[in-house]
Amino acid sequence: MYLPIFRGRQYELLALEEEVQQNLFCDISGGNQRIIPIVEPVNLTTRLTKTIESFIKQKSQIGIIFNPKSELASFDQDELFTFISAIENIHDYVIPVLYMTSDYDKTFLRLSDIGYSKADCIALCLEQPQIPILQEFYGNEPGSFRFVLVGESREFTRAIPREFGPKVICVD
């Protein structure tokens, strides 16, 4: 499984839209999706909406980071939830992605309100200070994630057990 992270700028979104229209994210033999791109929204634009709608139309999945790094995003979480909630058929094709930061619980609660469970989500635990936050989340909300993206260091593989979900090493 390959989970590339994009910053959600206009040209990246346009490229993703073209690639999904050509079915480049599916494996040729069985139609299984081997690549799930993850977008960290910078702005809430019509290009982002069109990109998500293209994935839905092609029945392909796309990950959206619901708590983007504040220095990247020029909007607040309320705007993102309103924006995403307005798109039809999001649950089958839009995978929520969460950075394991101090606000994860508020973000996850809002995701729960719109019908997502922990098993639907991908956790991003890329920095060592995020490991205890991920462990706390697992303790408060038992069950595994769809995937857990982890940093390259051995600290991640040692501290994050398999029960949390399939680990995917994130290389920058």
Task: Explain the meaning of each model-derived region.
Residues I133-D172:
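Long, charge-rich C-terminal accessory regions
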Residues M1, D27-S29, I90-V97, Y104-T107, ...:
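Non-catalytic accessory regions used for complex assembly or targeting
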Residues E18-E19, R47-S54, F108-S112, I133-F137:
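A short acidic, amphipathic alpha-helical/loop segment
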Residues Q10-Y11, P41-T46, P68-S74, T101-T107, ...:
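Short acidic, S/G/P-rich loop/turn micro-motifs used as interaction or catalytic elements
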Residues P37:
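Conserved, mostly hydrophobic/aromatic
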Residues E53-S117:
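A broadly used, surface-exposed interaction patch
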Residues V20-N32, F55-K57, E88-Y93, D113-K118, ...:
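Flexible, charged surface loops at secondary-structure boundaries
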Residues M1-G30, V42-T45:
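N-terminal basic/disordered segments at the start of proteins
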